[in-house]
Swiss-Prot record:
Family, per entry: Belongs to the UPF0761 family.
HAMAP family per UniProt: UPF0761
Entry-linked NCBIfam families: yihY_not_rbn
UniProt-annotated location(s): Cell inner membrane
Membrane topology label: Multi-pass membrane protein
Transmembrane segments: 29-49, 61-81, 117-137, 157-177, 201-221, 224-244, 264-284
Organism: Rhodospirillum rubrum (strain ATCC 11170 / ATH 1.1.1 / DSM 467 / LMG 4362 / NCIMB 8255 / S1)
Record keywords, A-Z: Cell inner membrane, Cell membrane, Membrane, Transmembrane, Transmembrane helix
Pfam short name (any one): Virul_fac_BrkB
Identification of the protein by name: UPF0761 membrane protein Rru_A2625
InterPro entries: UPF0761_bac, Virul_fac_BrkB, WH-like_DNA-bd_sf
């Protein structure tokens, strides 16, 4: 009997272990994907993505020729890249323009050739147009990622200069390496693979788009963006771009005939529509990357049974306590933005909203780098004022119950369950709370 019971328990244990390795239920996967999709759709509406895409498409139409002209001028300064200039332009048009490529390539080459004869003032105008495009891209992504403070003008200048000079040089180097390896293969008679031989017409554009958009989402916004978040947004944008490309070609070649409406000018409106749709996809990927932290935070709050009110109160108290500690320790610079992010473990959007409310109420002050200090003596700042700054009503239930964040429980229990006394606790008293001090 004992052996049978042991065998039965062992079998049940193995079954339980096997069940733990089974995939998540499809219903749960669909619910998770659905909740994230709804969050992204709301963010697309909030940020007015159609308007941003239209602005970028119009600016890109003006800046396309200046950008290519600047890139070719930079390559012309290096004799080794002379043979790669035409190949680079043709490859860009072939990769990213799905409709009437030959006409668009001819027009671009004509405009670039005309730009080569411009005076110094004309070159300055071309450069300014290219910089305006980069400014528009940066401001759009900063808005999507909720960046409150833009880069310093000098930092912007360095970033833009790096993009305008480094991008063409890297592309020229890639094409030169490709030509060099192809020449070796023909000379030696062996199958030396060129990097561009491996990037077939099917895989090349998606891989390039995935890499470029990942770097775009990581480097352009003036805030840290995790690689996984940027890669996820880039993957969404790349897949959407591939689907959009097929749909666009089907509509443009079968459904709507631009030649009938515009005749010889048909390439221009089609190209403008394609640029608008392409920027809409790029911005959608940026919104996806920006909303991942907020979605993860919402899931954690749901699992912990903590509502939005308690989460905002927790963030506000952690920020105020960190500022008070910096003040008490004589740190003139205050609690840094990086320290606050690590302390609250909160997405920038949620933290920025709380900081804005506290700043507006005069409870803290912020410097240009985002560091914070109390707006006045911590002994004169009460929990009730923090609640009022966040426009929150006092939590219901017993002190330390579900409405109160865990980190406040010890400090609030010192009030003996008296709400009035609890809400009158000063920021200095919260700093002195043992569990709070241990956590922070």
């Amino acid at each position: 009997m004992v052996d049978d019971e042991n065998r039965r328990r062992g079998l049940l244990g193995r079954r339980s272990h096997a069940r733990s390795w089974l995939p998540v239920k499809p219903r749960r996967i669909l619910a998770t994907a659905g909740s994230f999709t709804i969050l992204v759709l709301r963010a697309l509406i909030t940020h007015d993505i159609p308007r941003l895409a239209a602005s970028l498409a119009y600016t890109s139409l003006l800046a396309l020729v200046p950008l290519i002209a600047i890139a070719l001028a930079i390559l012309a300064a290096f004799p080794g890249f002379g043979d790669e200039r035409e190949r680079m332009v043709a490859w860009i048009i072939e990769t990213f323009v799905p409709y009437r490529r030959t006409e668009i390539l001819d027009q671009v080459e004509h405009f670039v050739g005309a730009a080569a004869g411009l005076t110094a003032l004309g070159v300055a105008g071309l450069t300014l147009t290219a910089i305006i495009l980069l400014l528009t891209i940066e401001s759009s992504l900063n808005a999507i990622f909720r960046v409150e403070k833009s880069r310093h003008p000098l930092a912007r200048l360095l970033v833009y200069w790096s993009v305008l000079t480094g991008g063409p040089l890297l592309m020229g180097l890639s094409f030169s390496l490709s030509s060099y390896l192809v020449a070796i293969r023909h000379l030696v008679g062996t199958d030396v693979m060129s990097p561009f031989d491996a990037l077939t017409p099917t895989l090349g554009p998606p891989l390039l788009s995935l890499t470029a958009m990942t770097l775009l989402y990581m480097l352009v916004p003036n805030r840290p963006v995790p690689l996984f978040h940027a890669l996820a947004g880039a993957l969404v944008a790349t897949l959407a771009s591939a689907l959009l490309r097929s749909a666009f070609l089907m509509v443009i070649t079968r459904g709507l005939s631009y030649e009938t409406l515009y005749g010889a000018l048909a390439a221009l409106p089609a190209f403008l529509v394609w640029m608008y749709l392409s920027w809409a996809v790029v911005l959608m990927g940026a919104v996806t990357a920006a909303e991942i932290p907020n979605w993860k935070m919402a899931r954690r709050l749901t699992r912990a049974g903590q509502d939005e009110r308690a989460a905002r109160l927790r963030i506000a108290v952690e920020i105020m306590v960190a500022a008070a500690r910096a003040y008490g320790e004589g740190q003139g610079d205050g609690a840094s933005r990086r320290a606050l992010s690590a302390l609250t473990a909160t997405p920038d959007r949620r933290q920025a909203g709380v900081l804005r409310d506290l700043d507006k109420a005069g409870l803290l002050i912020r410097d240009e780098d985002g560091a914070v200090l109390p707006g006045r003596d911590p002994r004169r700042i009460t929990l009730a004022e923090i609640l009022h700054a966040l426009t929150l009503a006092p939590p219901t239930g017993t002190v330390g119950g579900p409405g109160w964040p865990d980190l406040l429980r010890h400090a609030l229990e010192t009030a003996g369950g008296d709400y009035d006394r609890a809400l009158g606790l000063s920021l200095d008293a919260l700093v002195q709370a043992e569990p709070l001090g241990a956590r922070i």
